[in-house]
C-alpha cells in the first residue's frame, strides 16, 4: 500500500501456498500488485520455473507501463470513475467495498426465463482480480450459471472465490469436478486445473483436468470458452477482460462461430490490453466496453438471447 501510494511501480508477489500466504497475496493484489506467483516446490524443473517466472515478469512490466499511461491520460468523461461502490449482497448487507480504479454504475437487471440454457463465461489475467471485483458483485442473484477463469496459482483461487462471494449477490465458490451449474452460482476455476463445461442430461456440468498448460496457463481461458461454445452454442455470452497474451482469443472466436455473444474490455480501462486485443485481431469481439459498463453489457447480452 505504501509503495502504491508514494512510489508506484510494478509489483510481482511471490507467496507460499498456505492459507495465510494466499490471503496476504490477495490483499497485495487488491492494494495494487499486478501478479502473484506461488513459491515453487521441489518437483518443478529449473527450465519450467524460468519460463514461468519470465512470463510473469513480462506481464508485470506490461502492467506497470500501462498503468503509467492511464495515469497520464486526461479523464474520459464517458467513463464513470469512483473509489468505492455500495452493493446489497446476498446477506442483505449494504456493504461498501473498494474498487480502486473504476466503479459500478446503476443496478444491473437480468430477466429470468423458463427452460433457461444461457451460460456466462468470463476470462481474465493480469489486472483481472481488480476487474472481477468490479464485474461479479454487480451481477444479480438470478444471473445464469457463470464460470470464471482467472490466471492464478493453485490455492489462491479459493481465496479469490471467498472474497468475491463476500461482496456479491450471486454465490461464488471454487469449482469442483462434476458440479452441475445452476442459476445464481458463479464458479471460479481452481488454480492448476483447466475447466470445461459439458452439456449433459443433468444440465451444464463442470469438468476439471490437468492436461498440459496452454499459453503457459492452467487454467486457460481458451479451454473454457471453447467448451462453452460446444456445450451452449448460441446461448453463450463470453467476456474477456484485461490480461497479457492471447489466451481466450481463439475460444472467443469459437463462441462467435457457434452463434454466441462476445464482449471484450475496452483498451481505455485494461491494465494490460493483450487478451482483448488478440480477440479483436481475430474479429471475435462483438462489443467493446470499458470496465464500469461490462456488467450492463452482460445483462443486455443475456436478456437478448433467445431461449429454445
Role assignments for model-derived ranges:
Residues 1-308:
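Conserved acid/base catalytic micro-environments in cytosolic active-site loops
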